[in-house]
A protein has these predicted regions:
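Membrane-interface segments at or immediately adjacent to transmembrane helices
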Residues: 131-208
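Solvent-exposed soluble domains appended to multi-pass membrane proteins
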Residues: 194-200, 210-211, 216-487
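Membrane-proximal soluble helical/coiled-coil segments
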Residues: 72-75, 80-81, 85-86, 181, ...
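Transmembrane and membrane-interface helices of multi-pass
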Residues: 1-153
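Membrane-interface micro-motifs in multi-pass membrane enzymes
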Residues: 5, 52, 58-61, 74, ...
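Alpha-helical scaffold segments in carbohydrate-active enzymes
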Residues: 125, 149, 156, 232-235, ...
Length: 487
């Protein structure tokens, strides 16, 4: 971090300290509050980066509820680094106790002294506002060493420091309309599109499966396994009958599933939104035009499915705004068999088949699975890893082996689903894709084996980290295509 970035972070600390000093009148109390606050934020940010490869961002504060529901599935280990941090924190607390200076004594009454402190707090608003305004400048990178490209939050926070980067990102909690945009022009573009008409008898069922953290890590580098972890899906990707397949570039890595949902359902791109933002939490606060409303117009019944808590990522509210006819969350599932601590893909797909069989109208189902959600280090009685990665120059880890074993469970479940649908006389299309790749700690052995640095990737390597497989399969004749690259 350059000196100007260091100084700008120090300004935040001083403003924070002065506010509580004016309120309490004590340096000890002010320093204790500052130290405890920074310790909590620092530890939280450390574990967030460890688990999802991205720092805490302003809009994460809107996702605390979602994070809390899955936090107990992670292992929070006290590493040597954490122990060092804790020791340093305790040392600073002890030193702060020695600096017990108080606000200058005044002969005025207690009420007057309180008003003076309140006035000083109000005066502090001016430099604080100037500080934030300075960090909000679009051209700040032209005259400082700060990075505001929003290319990767992890790099931006490392370059700028946590609090400076956090405040710089906060300006994107609200987005402005781009130059030249108007509702009238957007509507004129829609009016230019031609519509095709179909009767209900012509419409196939459409099942969209966004499979949690499904990916093919072999795209990252060469390695072998004791057996293929996705033989059936790989056969679909290699050019199967009535199948369109390839790889998809997604906008997220290691988490933020809701953004892949947002892009698929709305057709909008995260490229036009701030890096790290969550549209489900930040921007979808009223009716949202999506593929769902279009399906409704065509005569489809529309169902969203997710075998976990309905409140996660604000789904219950967002799905309603998108116009889904029903949302089946964990409490609505009849098939609840678990793999580890999540509903298995096998059980999830059985639930999909039930919805299809019960539907009298052509069905559009958007299904977000949970089986493969992190973390991958905890042992479970109901999960026996079957896949082991093999390397020549490095060792595999339980994280990678467990992850690949989960991919095999998904592969078996997909084979079951398509086999069942092949025997159905209802025309059905299945769209399948992963929402993102796993975190860095899972795939790091692949990088080590291939002589690559996971923390210093080329553009091509970064693109491979955003790549997941997809296929579109039908139980009737469609034109085949393979090796597509889409986003």
């Amino acid at each position: 971090m350059e000196i100007d970035a260091v100084l700008l972070n120090l300004v935040f600390y001083y403003l924070f300290f002065l506010f509580f000093f004016f309120v309490s009148g004590s340096t000890k109390i002010s320093l204790d509050i500052l130290l405890i606050f920074t310790m909590i934020v620092g530890l939280a940010n450390y574990f967030v980066i460890l688990f999802r490869s991205s720092p805490i961002l302003p809009w994460d504060l809107l996702s605390v509820g979602t994070a809390a529901t899955v936090a107990n599935n992670y292992t929070f280990s006290i590493t040597y680094l954490v122990a060092q941090l804790a020791a340093g924190f305790l040392g600073c607390i002890i030193l702060a106790g020695k600096c017990n200076l108080h606000f200058p004594a005044l002969s005025a009454k207690k009420t007057i002294r309180g008003l003076i402190r309140l006035a000083l707090c109000c005066v502090l608003i001016i430099p604080s506002a100037c500080y934030v305004h300075f960090l909000y400048q679009p051209d700040i990178a032209d005259y400082t060493s700060l990075d505001n490209t929003l290319f990767t939050p992890k790099y931006m926070f490392k370059t700028n420091g946590f609090f400076v980067a956090f405040l710089m990102d906060s300006r994107y909690l609200r987005i402005d309309e781009p130059n030249g945009y108007s509702k009238e022009y957007a509507k004129s573009l829609l009016d230019e599109q031609t519509e095709t008409s179909s009767t209900a008898d012509d419409l196939p069922n459409i099942v969209v499966i966004m499979d949690e953290c499904f990916s093919d890590p072999t795209v990252l580098g060469d390695f072998s396994c004791n057996e293929d972890f996705m033989p059936y899906i790989r056969s679909l990707l290699d050019g199967a009958p009535n199948t369109i397949s390839g790889h998809l570039y997604v906008s997220v890595l290691g988490g933020n599933t809701a953004n892949s949902e947002f892009e698929y359902l709305t057709g909008d791109s995260m490229a036009f939104l701030p890096s790290g933002s969550i549209p489900y939490q930040q921007y979808l606060n009223k009716y949202a035009l999506s593929i769902v409303s279009h399906m409704e117009e065509l005569g489809y019944s529309t169902t969203a499915m997710h075998p976990y808590n309905a409140s996660g990522w604000n789904r219950s509210s967002v799905y309603e705004k998108m116009g889904f006819g029903q949302f089946l969350s964990l409490k609505n599932f009849h098939h609840g068999e678990q793999l580890r601590k999540y509903v298995s893909d096998q059980a999830d797909f059985e639930e999909v088949l039930d919805v299809l069989n019960q539907s009298t109208d052509p069905a559009f189902i958007f299904n977000v699975t949970m089986q493969n959600h992190s973390s991958y280090g905890t042992p479970y009685d109901n999960f026996t890893p079957s896949i082991e990665a093999k390397f020549k120059n490095t060792k595999s880890t339980k994280y990678l082996n467990n992850y690949l074993s989960l991919m095999k469970y998904t592969d078996d479940a997909v084979k079951y689903l398509l086999t069942e649908l092949s025997a159905s006389d209802k025309k059905t299309i299945v769209v399948f894709f992963g929402d993102h790749q796993p975190n860095d700690y899972v795939v790091e052995p692949i990088y080590e084996e291939n002589g690559l640095d996971i923390n210093n990737q080329t553009l091509e390597e970064q693109q491979k980290r955003q790549q997941v497989p997809f296929f579109i399969w039908a139980n009737y004749d469609i034109e085949e295509e393979s090796n597509l690259a889409i986003s």
